[in-house]
């Protein structure tokens, strides 16, 4: 309750300082996640003000199923000129975002292509999803998962069934300005660590984009 009361009066200066620190290190913060359908309009204002202070183009949240909330959030995002980008796990498919897109221009997708594959590529492949929806994708997540037929596993990059290289190449070839996040969700091998594994993922992306 105290946090709910504090948010509307919270200072943006710490977030501006955080943005400067990251920018000075060559890192752009393009999104942050705090939005919730249970928030008041005053809390929405706070979330979008933080997004602006951080330099974000969008704020993310799990995809709601309630049409009224999708419209409320999307219209608020459109007013603030910072998109609401909805994230999916294994409920992601070719039509999962259709309702959100139709209800407000402020609604976009933060699609996870690893989870999309783990859900079974319902309605089309990740590349087909990109071809159809690229203008409404604010950002996407990458991990290498297998299909349900192969236990929907999280595996080291290049050993699963998520078409990471074709996804990156399609985005690059079409010059779609869509940022992507590397998500390290497979088990870190013995003798390695998370930093080493993320470096491997970064190199995998570089190889894809220079092929």
Name each model feature, range by range.
Residues 1-17:
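Glycine-rich, proline-tolerant flexible connector loops at the mouths of alpha/beta enzymes
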Residues 5, 34, 190:
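Second-shell loop/turn segments in exported
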Residues 79, 96-211:
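Histidine-acidic metal/acid-base catalytic patches
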Residues 10, 14, 43, 65, ...:
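Soluble or luminal CAZymes and related metallo-dependent hydrolases
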Residues 15-17, 21-111, 116-120:
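Active-site acidic/histidine proton-transfer and metal-coordination neighborhood
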């Amino acid at each position: 309750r105290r946090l709910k009361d504090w948010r509307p009066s919270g200072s943006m200066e710490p977030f501006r300082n955080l943005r400067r620190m990251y920018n000075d290190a060559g890192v752009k913060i393009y999104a942050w996640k705090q939005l919730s359908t249970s928030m008041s309009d005053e809390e929405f204002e706070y979330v979008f003000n933080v997004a602006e202070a951080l330099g974000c183009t969008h704020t993310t949240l799990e995809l709601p199923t309630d049409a009224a909330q999708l419209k409320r959030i999307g219209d608020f995002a459109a007013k603030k000129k910072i998109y609401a980008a909805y994230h999916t796990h294994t409920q992601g498919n070719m039509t999962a975002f259709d309702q959100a897109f139709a209800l407000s221009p402020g609604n976009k997708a933060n699609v996870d292509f690893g989870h999309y594959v783990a859900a079974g590529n319902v309605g089309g492949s990740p590349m087909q999803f990109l071809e159809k929806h690229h203008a409404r994708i604010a950002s996407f997540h990458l991990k290498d998962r297998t299909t349900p037929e192969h236990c929907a596993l999280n595996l080291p990059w290049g050993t699963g069934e998520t078409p990471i290289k074709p996804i990156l190449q399609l985005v690059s070839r079409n010059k779609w300005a869509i940022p992507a996040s590397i998500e390290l969700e497979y088990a870190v091998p013995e003798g390695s660590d998370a930093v080493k594994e993320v470096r491997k993922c970064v190199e995998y992306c570089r190889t894809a984009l220079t092929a």
